[in-house]
């Protein structure tokens, strides 16, 4: 009886049909609230990066950004805004309502998720323009700083990584945001009107799935780029200069053996190895003197006789003649090099090169003079520093009067001013 009485008094309420739009609304509010709690705080490095970006603005005496400082910063970056737009931006960014933007207001605006989504993914019916879309000016100025590299590299990396992470965290919230309705039907053919939107598009592409990326590339291929766009032109330069245009030929025989023999050759001087010089002077010593009255060498005269004897030439004859021509050309170049070498030695004697280094207390004059004796006939210097020192040593042995340790009287004859100075110094020392 008790149980039946209990059943009679217990009445269940009828079930109600679920209202889907209310459930979606509640879920949407829960989802946005969950993301707000997920918001992370700024690290010390990120806070320092924002501080350095804040210091780039023109500020007043109190260290805050007023309307004049904001307009001056905008003008420096090449952005056009009138006083009314500046007032709206200042009013939107002034959180404590003191008429200025301090660092706390600056951080609150740039870390605000709604303003960030408004700057990155604007609403479809709102044109992405600074004049008609207040609240995104600080994002645009910050992106300009990154674009022109006004900040240090460390600060740029911190800011970009912060906003990239913020965009990835807000990617799911864009589904419920009124500014996210345009995200899935973006006009990729028209360039973005904002640098912040361009950075956001790059970040969006970096987190795309493979299927979405293929769709994006297919849509990008269907776009007709402008004819004056540099991206529509085919580059004429190699993209990989070390790889493109390199034709691998057939390797020579015994190349490794020759390389090992070359490395085993003894080196008398480091400069010979460094400049890869040839011993052209020994070759020039073997050159026969000119015996003909015409002034030409025997090799050139022999080639002239060959041309007179034969009127019809074959390929094999031309190959054989090539060696004679090369020998005659080398002989001619060596003869010119020897003549220039004599001229340079005469110039060294005239300027008394052995005394220039002593007078200036600079022994590198040998190397300097040797550099200016470069000859394209032998592709190296005609006189090395070693040759000049050997020449001075031979001259000093044969004629003591021309040595570097010559007497003050000899120096006074060759250079009167230098001799007078030395005589004055010696007389002063004698008086002391």
From Swiss-Prot:
<feature type="modified residue" description="Phosphotyrosine">
    <location>
        <position position="273"/>
    </location>
</feature>
<dbReference type="InterPro" id="IPR002048">
    <property type="entry name" value="EF_hand_dom"/>
</dbReference>
<dbReference type="GO" id="GO:0005509">
    <property type="term" value="F:calcium ion binding"/>
</dbReference>
<keyword id="KW-0479">Metal-binding</keyword>
<dbReference type="Pfam" id="PF13833">
    <property type="entry name" value="EF-hand_8"/>
</dbReference>
<feature type="binding site">
    <location>
        <position position="96"/>
    </location>
    <ligand>
        <name>Ca(2+)</name>
    </ligand>
</feature>
<dbReference type="InterPro" id="IPR011992">
    <property type="entry name" value="EF-hand-dom_pair"/>
</dbReference>
<feature type="binding site">
    <location>
        <position position="100"/>
    </location>
    <ligand>
        <name>Ca(2+)</name>
    </ligand>
</feature>
<feature type="binding site">
    <location>
        <position position="94"/>
    </location>
    <ligand>
        <name>Ca(2+)</name>
    </ligand>
</feature>
<feature type="compositionally biased region" description="Basic residues">
    <location>
        <begin position="420"/>
        <end position="432"/>
    </location>
</feature>
<dbReference type="InterPro" id="IPR018247">
    <property type="entry name" value="EF_Hand_1_Ca_BS"/>
</dbReference>
<feature type="binding site">
    <location>
        <position position="98"/>
    </location>
    <ligand>
        <name>Ca(2+)</name>
    </ligand>
</feature>
<feature type="binding site">
    <location>
        <position position="105"/>
    </location>
    <ligand>
        <name>Ca(2+)</name>
    </ligand>
</feature>
<feature type="domain" description="EF-hand 1">
    <location>
        <begin position="45"/>
        <end position="80"/>
    </location>
</feature>
<feature type="domain" description="EF-hand 2">
    <location>
        <begin position="81"/>
        <end position="116"/>
    </location>
</feature>
<keyword id="KW-0677">Repeat</keyword>
<keyword id="KW-0597">Phosphoprotein</keyword>
<protein>
    <recommendedName>
        <fullName>EF-hand calcium-binding domain-containing protein 3</fullName>
    </recommendedName>
</protein>
<feature type="compositionally biased region" description="Low complexity">
    <location>
        <begin position="399"/>
        <end position="411"/>
    </location>
</feature>
<keyword id="KW-0106">Calcium</keyword>
<feature type="region of interest" description="Disordered">
    <location>
        <begin position="394"/>
        <end position="432"/>
    </location>
</feature>
